[in-house]
Amino acid sequence: MKGFTKHSILMACSIGLAINATAADWDNIPIPAELDAGQSWELQQNYSDSFNYSGKNSTFTGKWKDSYFHSWTGPGLTHWSSDESWVGDGNLIISASRRQGTNKVNAGVITSKTKVKYPIFLEASIKVSNLELSSNFWLLSENDQREIDVLEVYGGARQDWYAKNMSTNFHVFFRNNDNSIKNDYNDQTHFTPTWGNYWRDGFHRFGVYWKSPTDVTFYIDGQKTTKGAWSQVVMKDKDYTGAILDKSRYNMDQEAFIIIDTEDHSWRSEAGHIATDADLADSDKNKMYVDWIRVYKPTGGSTTPPTGDITPPSGYTNLQLAHSNRCVDVINGALWNGSTYQQYSCNTGNNNQRFKFTKIANNQYSINAKVSQLCMELASGSSANGAKVQQWICNHANSNQTWSLEDKGSNTFEIRNKQSGKCLEVANSSNANGGQIRQWACTGATNQRFKFL
């Protein structure tokens, strides 16, 4: 266990062995998120902590508050208390106990003293508690309107499914004047442990690369998750109106505090899923451990900002997706009206993937497939998300066959339909061959970004 390793190092120091006092626990653990060409990671000292000290000394108080960032004492039966967090044995410890004389729960919480903002990578090594309470690692904007949950799990839930399934979550809140919730657009994505039976069985790494307001991706035990990224979620106001969020207007665009805590959520306690007095008093169950947290920003590199209109090649070219590195492909090399497109492994010698851009007006083009000599068309000129994109006999007077290229930087661009104003994308951010090419509201996500190949 990590605490044992740190204790051993201290013993080694006492007998005179030389060690690097500035080494961090994560130094030999690669950062799993990918950088753009020429970039490097820069450690953010104000938020990174190995917890290689005891008590809440100046290192702790220089980075963290042992309370929430404002006066709220927590959801449901939660009562956040500074007495329920401390540093010892090389870990931050977040505990819980019964609040004397009440049915409430004293719970630990720490909050970063200042806010973070994209682009930024955060990762923590955490062993969750064995309680009905949730163990959490999350980000929340100061106005309580934007939330990114890197970890939420009921580690000791008596319902097995909840103990085995942690979630990553997004929330976009709209609030009333008294800060009560008017709308809560959210989506959750669940994951079982990469090893062991329960998340409480040991330390796991939970990370997020908040690259931009529309590019947020999670990492578990050093692996990028295949689901749950901002580009993949459907944000629904489940508890209020049932409406779907327009992600082309609202996204993860606000700076946020880092929060590590435990909570008794009202929806669970109201359903009878309550931490018992015995469990809350059990020192083997009532603690969440954080071995370390590291935070980095990407710096430097040759990444170029948007500069204006994109100029296509004069001849035929492939269209490569930024998120999957696969190419737009006419399915089965079809030659008829109404046939459709997919993404497929790139092959510049495959005519199914070769397209020519014919200029119609300033930054307006038709897109002609070499294999069929048919043009890319938005079926029926639909404005709906998910609308079919098909091949059809070319007619440059049709606005549903007219596309503009919007520069997104780093030699990538969006392809927008003139009639609908919406973007081409790969459905559900699929990385697989056969991923559907369709129309969707423009979000800036990488499954809507293309480059010439």
UniProtKB/Swiss-Prot annotation:
Q: Which UniProt keywords apply?
A: Disulfide bond, Glycosidase, Hydrolase, Lectin, Secreted, Signal
The record places the active site at 147 (nucleophile), 152 (proton donor)
A Pfam family per the record: Ricin_B_lectin
Q: Name one GO biological process term.
A: carbohydrate catabolic process
* Gene3D superfamilies cross-referenced by the UniProt entry: 2.60.120.200, 2.80.10.50
Its cellular-component GO annotations read:
extracellular region
Identify the EC number(s): 3.2.1.81
Q: Where is the signal peptide?
A: 1-23
Q: Give the molecular function GO annotations.
A: beta-agarase activity; carbohydrate binding
Q: Specify the domain of life of the species encoding this protein.
A: Bacteria
Domain Ricin B-type lectin positions: 313-453
Subcellular location per the Swiss-Prot or TrEMBL entry: Secreted
Q: What are the disulfide bonds?
A: 327-346, 375-394, 423-442
Q: Which SUPFAM superfamilies match?
A: Concanavalin A-like lectins/glucanases, Ricin B-like lectins
Q: Which reaction does it catalyse?
A: Hydrolysis of (1->4)-beta-D-galactosidic linkages in agarose, giving the tetramer as the predominant product
Q: Which PROSITE patterns match?
A: GH16_2, RICIN_B_LECTIN
Q: Which residues form the GH16 domain?
A: 24-301
Its family? Answer: Belongs to the glycosyl hydrolase 16 family.
Protein name per its UniProtKB record = Beta-agarase AgaB34
Q: Which organism is it from?
A: Agarivorans albus
